[in-house]
């Protein structure tokens, strides 16, 4: 071997000795650069609210008429933000709408209860008898007898009497709702709950029991209609339950236990995106349910206006009556969306009555399923919102016909409380979608894109490092 070849071999050995350290440094440098760029984008997204990307908040991807309704998305968002949501937020804090009577413990009529959740947030703080309004304790107006199922082993939570005041609630009598499984006729096992002290939020209620509730609702009582379905009646129940489900998920994600050890609560945007925002049909169904319930409230205007919301606190009761009238007679509502949903188009034709009975039975089963929820606070809000939805169905589809045996609307106090609180829950969910969805969707889609790009990015880094060898 000549001297030139020997020198070239020695030079090549020296280059190999520093290629690997240099390649390692390149890998580290590029990985840090990629990580820093990713993290800086996430931080920038949250810190700079005035960036040009925020202009997307004003557009939104939900436009045009809401399916099967009489209003468009932009009108609903503006009306909800400017008028309805502020009114409802004030209304549900008044003494009349703050207290809800509920049977918290009842045997599940379908299967043994085996799904208690693990967090203290599952439990409900009941009202002592001296807290809820005195008029609520007065004798109720006699009404129709009830043959509903009674709990055989449910523990009495408050032993509070049924309370509809003959003077305070003109026309509010004990009456059956053909759409719901009424279990509030046994006063001995009823409790009054302050809804403001028991907010709808994450409770840790998960697992087979929670899944079984929704599986039973969707598979047995509320199957999704086929893509070619033209019968509107068959769509209504599914869309209502889907919209309610989406709203419940929205509230859970918005008030989530992020760190149990530190009792840190906040918004779980990943859950919000995964459960609701990345599914446009769920968002649309939420808007549909909101307008459906809003239509029920406006249709009951004459009844709700004449009722007295007596709690014994004169100033607060006057405020409640004023807020109710502002809600019912809002000029913006009457101008922009006077008929949110047209119920007259349903139940037409020869099969209409039979179809209505079928859907009533399905919704009654859904109502009864709330007794199978293995979490006290989840059961509270499930019962309240399902009763509110059942009240909306009663107002829209059971007035002036044989379903209730009378030509005039009659509501229980608890039905009105549930109806207004449900409307507020849906209003909050719609507002959160409008306010948050552009930012949340953009952030989550960016993160998904970056996670998907990681394998290719690492491969490029490795190829670059190997090229030095």
From Swiss-Prot:
Its cofactor is FAD. It is an enzyme of class 1 (oxidoreductase). It comes from Arabidopsis thaliana. Coiled coil: none annotated. PANTHER family: ENDOPLASMIC RETICULUM OXIDOREDUCTIN-1, ERO1-RELATED. Glycans are attached at residue 365. InterPro entries: Ero1, ERO1-like_sf. Pfam families: ERO1. May function both as a monomer and a homodimer. Keywords: Disulfide bond, Electron transport, Endoplasmic reticulum, FAD, Flavoprotein, Glycoprotein, Membrane, Oxidoreductase, Redox-active center, Signal, Transport. This is Endoplasmic reticulum oxidoreductin-1. N-glycosylated. Belongs to the EROs family. It is a peripheral membrane protein. Essential oxidoreductase that oxidizes proteins in the endoplasmic reticulum to produce disulfide bonds. Acts by oxidizing directly PDI isomerase through a direct disulfide exchange. Does not act as a direct oxidant of folding substrate, but relies on PDI to transfer oxidizing equivalent. Does not oxidize all PDI related proteins, suggesting that it can discriminate between PDI and related proteins. Its reoxidation probably involves electron transfer to molecular oxygen via FAD. Acts independently of glutathione. Disulfide bonds join 52-71, 54-69, 108-372, 117-122, 222-231, 375-378. GO terms for cellular component: endoplasmic reticulum; endoplasmic reticulum membrane. Residues 1-36 form the signal peptide. One of its GO terms (biological process) is protein folding in endoplasmic reticulum. It comes from the Eukaryota. Its EC number is 1.8.4.-. It is found in: Endoplasmic reticulum membrane.
């Amino acid at each position: 071997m000549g001297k030139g070849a020997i020198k070239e071999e020695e030079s090549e050995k020296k280059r190999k000795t520093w290629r690997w350290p240099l390649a390692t440094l390149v890998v580290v440098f590029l990985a840090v650069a990629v990580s820093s760029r990713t993290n800086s984008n996430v931080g920038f997204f949250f810190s700079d609210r005035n960036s040009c990307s925020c202009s997307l908040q004003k557009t939104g991807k939900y436009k045009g008429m809401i399916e099967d309704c009489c209003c468009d998305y932009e009108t609903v968002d503006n009306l909800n933000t400017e008028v309805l949501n502020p009114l409802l937020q004030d209304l549900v804090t008044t003494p009349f709408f703050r207290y809800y009577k509920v049977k918290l413990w009842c045997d599940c009529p379908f299967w043994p209860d085996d799904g208690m959740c693990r967090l203290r947030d599952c439990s409900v703080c009941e009202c002592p008898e001296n807290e809820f309004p005195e008029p609520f304790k007065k004798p109720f107006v006699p009404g129709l007898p009830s043959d509903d199922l009674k709990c055989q082993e449910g523990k009495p939570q408050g032993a509070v009497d049924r309370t509809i005041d003959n003077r305070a609630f003109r026309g509010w009598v004990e009456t059956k709702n053909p759409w719901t499984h009424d279990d509030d006729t046994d006063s001995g096992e009823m409790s009054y709950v302050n809804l403001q002290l028991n907010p709808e939020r994450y409770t840790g209620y998960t697992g087979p029991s929670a899944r079984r509730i929704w599986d039973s609702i969707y598979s047995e009582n509320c199957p999704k209609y086929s893509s070619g379905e033209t019968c509107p009646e068959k769509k209504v129940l599914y869309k209502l339950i889907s919209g309610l489900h989406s709203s419940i998920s929205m509230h859970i994600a918005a008030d989530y236990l992020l760190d149990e050890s530190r009792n840190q609560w906040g918004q779980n945007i990943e859950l919000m995106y995964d459960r609701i925002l990345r599914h446009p049909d769920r968002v649309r169904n939420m808007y549909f349910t909101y307008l459906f319930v809003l239509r029920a409230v406006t249709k009951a205007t004459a009844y709700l206006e004449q009722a007295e919301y007596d709690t014994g606190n004169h100033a607060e009761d006057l405020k409640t009556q004023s807020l109710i009238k502002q809600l019912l007679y809002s000029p913006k509502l009457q101008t922009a969306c006077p008929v949110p949903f047209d119920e007259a188009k349903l139940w037409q034709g020869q099969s209409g009555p039979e179809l209505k009975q079928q859907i009533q039975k399905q919704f009654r089963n859904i109502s009864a399923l709330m007794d199978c929820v293995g979490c006290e606070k989840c059961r509270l809000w499930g019962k309240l919102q399902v009763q509110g939805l059942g009240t909306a169905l009663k107002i829209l589809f059971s007035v002036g016909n044989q379903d209730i045996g009378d030509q005039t609307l009659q509501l229980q106090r608890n039905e009105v409380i549930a109806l207004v609180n449900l409307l507020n829950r849906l209003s909050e969910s719609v507002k959160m979608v409008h306010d948050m969805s552009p930012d949340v969707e953009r952030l989550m889609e960016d993160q998904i894109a970056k996670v998907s790009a990681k394998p290719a990015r690492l491969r490029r880094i490795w190829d670059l490092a190997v090229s030095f060898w």
